[in-house]
């Protein structure tokens, strides 16, 4: 999982990427291609 400052570029990398919020953190998840996972990092 990558930790990046802005999820804007992460969510457009693949059409199956979804932005979800868990425990106050924002994540990008992708069920079909899990290597696109990312987390907002501040």
Swiss-Prot record:
Disulfide bonds: none annotated. Keywords: Ribonucleoprotein, Ribosomal protein. Belongs to the bacterial ribosomal protein bL36 family. The keyword Signal does not apply. It holds the Pfam family Ribosomal_L36. It comes from the Bacteria. One of its GO terms (molecular function) is structural constituent of ribosome. GO terms for cellular component: ribonucleoprotein complex; ribosome. This is Large ribosomal subunit protein bL36. PANTHER family: 50S RIBOSOMAL PROTEIN L36 2, LARGE RIBOSOMAL SUBUNIT PROTEIN BL36B. It comes from Ehrlichia chaffeensis (strain ATCC CRL-10679 / Arkansas). Transmembrane segments: none annotated. One of its GO terms (biological process) is translation.
């Amino acid at each position: 999982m990558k930790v990046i400052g802005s999820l804007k570029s992460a969510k457009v990398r693949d059409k199956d990427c979804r932005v979800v919020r868990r425990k106050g953190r924002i994540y990008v998840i992708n069920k079909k291609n899990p290597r696109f996972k990312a987390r907002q990092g501040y």
